[in-house]
Amino acid sequence: MSTPSIPQFPSPFSPFSSGSQSTGMAPSQTVGLDTLAEGSQYVLEQLQLSRDAAGTGAGDGATSTSLRNSMSHAKDQPLFDDERNQSAGSGFKNTLQRDPLVEARSAIRKNSSSAPVRRRISRACDQCNQLRTKCDGQHPCAHCIEFGLTCEYARERKKRGKASKKDLAAAAAAATHGSNGHSGQANASLMAERTSEDSRPAQDVNGRYDSTFESHHISSQPSHMQHANNAGISGLHDSQTAPSHSQPSLGTTIDAMHLGHFNTLNDSGRPAMSMSDLRSLPPSVLPPQGLSSGYNASAFALVNPQEPGSPANQFRLGSSAENPTAPFLGLSPPGQSPGWLPLPSPSPANFPSFSLHPFSSTLRYPVLQPVLPHIASIIPQSLACDLLDVYFHSSSPSHLSPSSPYVVGYIFRKQSFLHPTKPRLCSSGLLASMLWVAAQTSEAPFLTSPPSARGRVCQKLLELTIGLLRPLVHGPATGEASPNYAANMVINGVALGGFGVSMDQLGAQSSATGAVDDVATYVHLATVVSASEYKAASMRWWTAAWSLARELKLGRELPPNVSHARQDGERDGDGEADRRHPPTLITSLGHGPGSSGINVTEEEREERRRLWWLLYATDRHLALCYNRPLTLLDKECGGLLQPMNDDLWQVGDFAAAAYRQVGPPVECTGHSMYGYFLPLMTILGGIVDLHHAENHPRFGLAFRNSPEWERQVQDVTRQLDTYGRSLKEFEARYTSNLTLGTAENEPAVEGAHLDHTSPSGRSSSTVGSRVSGSIMHTRMVVAYGTHIMHVLHILLAGKWDPVNLLEDHDLWISSESFVSAMSHAVGAAEAAAEILEHDPDLSFMPFFFGIYLLQGSFLLLLAADKLQGDASPSVVRACETIVRAHEACVVTLNTEYQRTFRKVMRSALAQVRGRIPEDFGEQQQRRREVLALYRWSGDGSGLAL
């Protein structure tokens, strides 16, 4: 079926009738311009100018007469002209047709007696919108230029309602059907859509109904066009109501791609028009010639006609001859008038800025591509890239130290994520969680103004992360939409309860098919929730992370790769290729003999190790925080390699870390959490086991009085002494040797990572600055390690529960263990003073440090409460240091238990200094009531209220 050619219409509002222009403007053509008016208000401007000129006939009678003659002449001209049919394919006007219109516009504006009416701009920039300031709509606007602000049009355009999925599927199916040899029917359908838009009652600029235009348009329309329109309308109606059997997978595929983010293009006085960005669809979904194959002369394209430096996020009319898919896929066709309407291309000032969320072809970090369709309505693309920078930003120029308090340790390599051409393949849930973590502390203007912006964005990112993660349902059945699809599934008499077991997984080795990325996503969620006031709720996410890590067998080394491509010894020579090779997502769970043929990169192996050791450390840390037993056992990771040095890890020098120990470490080896904090958590695990064995309701008393108890305590004490010696060796290696200049032959770790960590690191231009930064970082590590080591001594010898400690029913204060524990409490306070000297805001490890500061303070509170004015000066100084440390913690990572204990400690310190209140007994009782909220005895849950 051939599509009737659409003629090239004359210039509709030309006030002059030239010889070269043999036809005028038919009244029926006015309604036909509604399609153009959907994209811009250029035609409305021309109509307004013409009527203004007609109203000022006294000022310029010739112009008014010429305009009336032109309008009356247009009524007598036929709608189609053979000469114009021959040139209908041309999208450009010749000079004879263009110049009279330009001259007419100049004459009308020159002779208009009234002042120009200020037109309302279509959209204000983001800064003016937030500040509620008048904006001129330019890019950049005058307000932003005056105050030096960043002028952007990146926020989402609000809309009413959303496009129907049925309409999207029907339109895509119709386009695909047209590309398979039925282009004529597709043309008729699209023609019917435009005709249905044109068939609305004609309105002038003031909104009045013009019945003559409407009746003339209907009566003057050729019969063959009416027939085509009717056929197109009926065909479109059928495609919307009847299910599509020829393309069964297209609609479901589009639904699966979450095309829920639509940007609205609003024209004044016209209904909203939604347009979705389909660039995220895979090639298999799109038809061979694109979505517009049935209508190559589509007039809707996403371009910016104003300046070349601005993003391609504007809406204008243009031909798509170069790329038929351009109007739908957001590409930029050449700016010109469409061939079916020979109007001159209006100036950029006539285009209102219909801002869409751009999907720039020059994405700074291509790793974000999977999550871009989901975050388009939440944050701009540039902000997403900035948040990735925040996530990987290091606060130290010498050694890696995450600046975000919610990034407790680096699991992934920065270069793998931020690589410009070959980034790591990541799940959308992991990327969304990383953006959510970074948005908690980012100082981007988009998140700080207005003050409620951060909370709104973080809430949307959290909902997106959970939606993409589908908690506890890692393997949904095909076509199932609900995450709880198996909640009522019963197979062989067993209720599966919605924990990820589907019909096709019953014969698999495991019930979950989650990948390493899912575990990391759980870690991000759990970390932020743990740092909030809802600490008990964080255990849901931690438990899911620990369980999935155990199912993935992250505590075991993967079998070696099949070495058929390279001989022994050749792996180290191709380290660059290994670093650039994007690792695949590990979704295989049973790494047994049957899966030994899987080739896994060394980077992916190290990711698995670091993820396990991070979970291992947090398991022991939270066991102390929440008074709970251990989940991950030492025997599960006895053969797992210890994590490699963070600096070597980020550089990707896997060959330098080929020789490592296996099993949980007990010595300080580096500046990162894995180097100095993980060994302490290994020792803490033994202390936690002893604590719960001592308080066991049945075997606790017998174990406490047995020789086995003393032997276990001595073993843990030896581990603490070993850690203390390694800490001194570590300090000597990275302070004394560097100061004397004898560490030049050490592995180039101190400065090797400076080319990829942070701008501050890259700006260090001298060796002296790097050495001083390394020494400062080392002293902070030693101070934190010393403090936590003293606290572990206290936990091993003393009582964890503050109320039992203050009541002292068993007279533990008179024992030798109390004297030993008290000396460690003073030592911990001295280490805290050194920490405050090097890290005044306690931002080095705020997520972990709070509980150790609290447990190390209970003995000082006991001394202040019991001794009061008789306390020694060292105890008084220690109490003052603890109060200052808690005040710094409250500023950095504000939590309720730190605020509460600060008040309790200040009250006790006032009594030590002699300021005893009249209600002394009530003050002591109130302190005990406050401390009773946090119990570590019996069924107490510690900090988890």
Swiss-Prot record:
SMART domains found in the cross-reference section? Fungal_trans, GAL4
Entry-linked SUPFAM superfamilies: Zn2/Cys6 DNA-binding domain
Stretches of Basic and acidic residues bias are at 565-581
Keywords per UniProt: Activator, DNA-binding, Metal-binding, Nucleus, Transcription, Transcription regulation, Zinc
Q: Which residues bind DNA?
A: 125-151
Gene Ontology molecular function: any one: DNA binding
InterPro entries noted in UniProt: Transcription_factor_dom_fun, XlnR/Xlr1, Zn2-C6_fun-type_DNA-bd_sf, Zn2Cys6_DnaBD
Q: Which domain of life is it from?
A: Eukaryota
Does the keyword field hold Transcription regulation?
Answer: yes
Work out whether the entry's keyword set contains Transcription: yes
The primary site where this protein sits is nucleus
A single GO CC term for this protein reads: nucleus
Q: Where is the composition biased (Low complexity)?
A: 14-24
Region annotation (Disordered) ranges: 1-33, 53-74, 172-251, 559-601
Composition-biased stretches (Polar residues): 177-188, 218-251
Subcellular location per the Swiss-Prot or TrEMBL entry: Nucleus
Give GO BP annotations, semicolon-separated: DNA-templated transcription; positive regulation of DNA-templated transcription; xylan catabolic process
Query: Which family does the record assign?
Result: Belongs to the xlnR/xlr1 family.
What does the function comment of this entry state?
Transcriptional activator of the xylanolytic system. Involved in the regulation of extracellular cellulolytic and xylanolytic genes and in the regulation of the intracellular activities of D-xylose catabolic genes in the pentose catabolic pathway (PCP) in response to the presence of D-xylose.
Q: What is this protein called?
A: Xylanolytic transcriptional activator xlnR
